[in-house]
Amino acid sequence: MELSDSEVARPREMVPACLLLLLAESPGHGYQLMERLKPLGFDWHGPGPIYRELRALEEAGLVTSTWAVGPTGPGRRVYELTAAGRASLDRSVAGVAGLQGLVAQYLDRYRRLPPPRRTVRRAAS
């Protein structure tokens, strides 16, 4: 099995916490949130995964949504953080801080590894 950089560097388990963080900053609709996740390292080819996460957060009572009709274009579901969502966000910080420590240890140990050995093939005679 080979791990890609995106599988390791951007664990899917961080998406709900990142969505809660973004909604604590300001409410938003799915496409906005998808764009706001990009600087955090998450980039999807479509909004499906974001809407699934938002639906799960709403079912858990961590976010609410309202239908907003804009002056132009179709209406959109706008998501907001609830008090329970803020409490969940506050609790998630300890877990994220733990990940930060784990990543720091991982990188430190990786940097101390000896360089890879090269194998020399002998030419066939």
Regions found by a protein language model. Name each.
Residues 1-7:
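Short, intrinsically disordered or compositionally biased N-terminal tails of bacterial proteins
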Residues 30-33, 57, 96:
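Alpha-helical transition-metal enzyme core signature, strongest for iron centers
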Residues 51-58:
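Short, hydrophobic-biased segments on the C-terminal half of alpha helices
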Residues 58-73, 80:
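Beta-hairpin "wing" of winged helix-turn-helix
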